[in-house]
Amino acid sequence: MKLSTTSKEDFFKHWPGHWPDKDNFVNPHKATKEQYLAFKGLIDQKPLETEIEAFLKDNKEILALITFLFSTGHHASWLYPKQYLRLPASSTSGKIPDYIVAGANSDGVSWFVLELKGANENAFINNSKRVHLTSVANKGICQLIEYIDISTRSQSYLRDEINLKGYREPKGILLIGTEEESENTQVREFKSAWNRMNSRIQIYSYNRLLRTIENAIKPS
């Protein structure tokens, strides 16, 4: 069942039993050119993480299109902002990704944990002829590793207690920076190598997401 080719009434009437709940459903096919242009204008200013979060909170359809980067979400998408994966306790801090994201296609539902960083940040540093992660990107990667590990160890709790139906084996996504840093050949090649070798945690710039959004909203 694909929302882009089905009436809204039929879509919700025939909601598949294995899909997540309807409350967090977001229709990525409702993303508009106006939303895209507003988001592009924002990213062009290299905003802080908080500014990006504020925009996406009011433009969920734009963020839902991140699932298209992984060839899913065409049937339906779901967004869970600031959802606890682990509640805080006396000896441990709570674990809250910026978003839990789900996308459905003909193969089923795929899950992701998303960490946002500012478009003003870089993912990589190139000095002394070596490329390595910036402190901001490294923090984001470590956060995603924790989220994925907790998700793997607590799947039953997350599915049953906080109603993440079907939640399993999420991939991590770090959104950070723009493609300006990839103008450096070494950085571009290192980033490409990272994403090839680390399929569980992918690093993308906001420009990459913008291209995906632009392609999705083009008239067919």
Functional labels for PLM-detected ranges:
Residues 1-220:
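Charged, terminal alpha-helix-loop-beta segments
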